[in-house]
């Protein structure tokens, strides 16, 4: 007995973790600065931590009330009906739910390149396929409606990442509206706003009252600091009211995750602090790194260093973990997550020294 042929399914490549690098290099994890996964360097809200502790004795019970409470809270936050909010285990869980709701076998999605590999992974898991539109370095990774429409050929789902990972560029509101009014009736625009809290651009969720072909993804992993709990959600058109119950995984969002997310929503001060810190860090990175960078509205900065693998490996040996963007098709670039002031300044010092010493690829 063997699994089906999975040769067309490329595995997801995450940023390297502190424990992984520490074991490999024989270092103390406490001596490492991890800026590879766009996590919140300030951690979760203290209110979320307290909620996790309070919820711990209840983990023997399937989550129902907490899931409902979180759904209703998010619906109220965004001015939607509860049926329009699909809570999921991370934003990637929402990607799966939307794929199940939309794709028939052999349907295609259109996704950005470079971009989040799970868009196409989910499509292929569900017997669909993927084609790409290029967010080009030659154009400073600018995102426009024309860029997408030039590649569009009636795909059932079109993914738009704003802010875009790993570049930090945004799709302006007027460009999104143009897309919503230009694609065919059967096409769903999926706007991935995992990094939306860090951007100035308004959320696509505001458009759901006007357009029935737009859905938006959000997560608690970034600005809210709950990456380890895997909790996110999609906001979908009102006409989709009964679809969630038919496509979601039973009890996929845990009781602890839902309670922590509810508490995190109550701590706006922590989110504001996290966003302000990220904006300071990305400005500092762009101003002080001795290498080309691009304007970013995420909690990270893309940096051109010549040989990303060499720079990444050298930085690790000096205790700074950053993301080699070779897996994004950018072997000359690294992505540096926004850290605390101390972490950011350490990263700049280490990277500037390494970039001056590592030969250009």
From Swiss-Prot:
Q: Tell me, what is one Gene Ontology molecular-function annotation carried by this entry?
A: pyridoxal phosphate binding
**Pfam families reported in the protein's UniProt record:** Aminotran_1_2 (PF00155)
Membrane-spanning ranges: none
Identify the EC number(s).
2.6.1.9
Q: Which GO terms describe its biological process?
A: L-histidine biosynthetic process
Q: Which reaction does it catalyse?
A: L-histidinol phosphate + 2-oxoglutarate = 3-(imidazol-4-yl)-2-oxopropyl phosphate + L-glutamate
Region annotated Disordered sits at 26-45
Provide the cofactor list for this protein.
Answer: pyridoxal 5'-phosphate
Tell me the route in metabolism or biology where this protein functions: Amino-acid biosynthesis; L-histidine biosynthesis; L-histidine from 5-phospho-alpha-D-ribose 1-diphosphate: step 7/9
Primary enzyme class: transferase
The cross-references to Gene3D superfamilies, in alphabetical order and at most eight, read: Aspartate Aminotransferase, domain 1, Type I PLP-dependent aspartate aminotransferase-like (Major domain)
Question: Per UniProt, which keywords does this protein have?
Answer: Amino-acid biosynthesis, Aminotransferase, Histidine biosynthesis, Pyridoxal phosphate, Transferase
PTM annotation (N6-(pyridoxal phosphate)lysine): residues = 222
* PANTHER family assigned to the protein according to its UniProt record, in alphabetical order: HISTIDINOL-PHOSPHATE AMINOTRANSFERASE, HISTIDINOL-PHOSPHATE AMINOTRANSFERASE 2
Instruction: Return the similarity comment.
Output: Belongs to the class-II pyridoxal-phosphate-dependent aminotransferase family. Histidinol-phosphate aminotransferase subfamily.
Xref: NCBIfam families: hisC
Q: What is this protein called?
A: Histidinol-phosphate aminotransferase
Origin organism is Haloferax volcanii (strain ATCC 29605 / DSM 3757 / JCM 8879 / NBRC 14742 / NCIMB 2012 / VKM B-1768 / DS2)
